[in-house]
Regions:
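Core register positions within helices of long alpha-helical scaffolds
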Residues: 5-8, 36-39, 66-69, 97, ...
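TPR/Sel1-like alpha-solenoid repeat signature
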Residues: 37, 51, 63, 67, ...
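Alpha-helical adaptor scaffolds
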Residues: 150, 154, 158, 166-173, ...
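Amphipathic alpha-helical scaffolding segments comprising HEAT/armadillo-like alpha-solenoid repeats
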Residues: 10-22, 42-53, 72-84, 103-115, ...
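Conserved hydrophobic register position within alpha-solenoid helical repeats
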Residues: 2-5, 33, 63, 94, ...
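Short inter-helical turns and helix N-cap capping residues of alpha-solenoid HEAT/ARM repeat scaffolds
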Residues: 25-26, 55-56, 86-87, 117-118, ...
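Alpha-helical segment of the N-proximal tetratricopeptide repeat
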Residues: 2-9, 17-39
């Protein structure tokens, strides 16, 4: 099947055939079929809801994705019902759809899924809650900072940083000593973006690392925070550093702070 075939099906009103195309072996065809179905809007919602019961998981994934793109509130309850009944790989798509529809009633459901036994489900729930920005999610996301999976901890940091809650600098700063370099970098970046000066000391501690991403993100964050207290530590890190990329980040941070002091 080609893209043109999908468009012909849509033009002829053969919407069920379009739904069956969600099972195509080619990922780009499946994705294009989702896009066409989503563009058709409310008139295909009943067919897409029925497709949530399809025997092929790829069809169920595509149907959920299309429903999320359409944003129909009518799809909320069918999606919620299917969430706990389907396999984790499909449940991910259902969570994404619920979040895109954006009704506040789904927040407790997403919060519950942050404690799911399946890693993909936890990851998707944490990411979706960050996109929604509902403060009810904060205690659940804090719990996910101690998740066994690096990628869930990383996403929890990013989601919490979107909540615009100044006090969250404290639990996020604890991740600066995480075993994962990616998580440490995400925590440093989040602290810089949050702008809370109370995070300065924790970020200074990260300058003692030899890991490139630690130094890069710590320098960038400290530059954003413009703390004079960090200057001596940034300069000391520069003296012992030889990597060009890190030197540039340290120089930029020093310049940001010194320029701010002069103004």
């Amino acid at each position: 099947m080609e893209r043109e075939d999908l468009e012909s099906l849509a033009n002829r009103g053969e919407y069920q055939a379009l739904i069956e195309a969600l099972a195509d072996p080619q990922p780009f065809i499946r994705l294009h079929a989702v896009g066409i179905l989503a563009s058709l809007g409310e008139k295909v919602v009943p067919l897409l809801v029925d497709a949530l019961d399809h025997h092929n998981p790829e069809v169920r994934k595509g149907a959920a994705k299309a429903l999320g793109e359409i944003g129909s509130k009518e799809a909320l309850m069918p999606l919620i019902i299917k969430l706990d009944k389907d396999i984790p790989s499909v449940a991910q798509f259902i969570l994404e759809a619920l979040a895109k529809i954006g009704d506040s009633s789904v927040v407790p459901i997403l919060c519950r899924c942050t404690r799911h036994h399946s890693l993909p489900v936890r990851y998707s729930a944490v990411r979706c809650l960050g996109n929604l920005g509902d403060r009810r999610a904060i205690p659940f996301l804090i719990d996910n900072l101690s998740d066994t999976a690096n990628i869930v901890r990383l996403r929890a940091v990013e989601s919490l940083a979107k909540m615009e809650e100044p006090s969250l600098w404290s639990p996020i700063s604890e991740l600066l000593t995480d075993e994962s370099a990616g998580v440490r970098a995400a925590a440093a970046k989040a602290l810089g973006n949050m702008g809370n000066p109370r995070a300065v000391d924790a970020l200074i501690g990260l300058l003692g690392s030899d890991v490139e991403t630690d130094l890069l993100e710590a320098a960038r964050a400290l530059g954003k925070l413009k703390s004079r207290r960090a200057l001596a530590f940034l300069k000391a890190a520069r003296e012992r550093e030889g990597r060009e990329k890190v030197l540039k980040a340290l120089d930029e941070a020093i310049y940001q702070i010194e320029s701010d002091v002069q103004t």
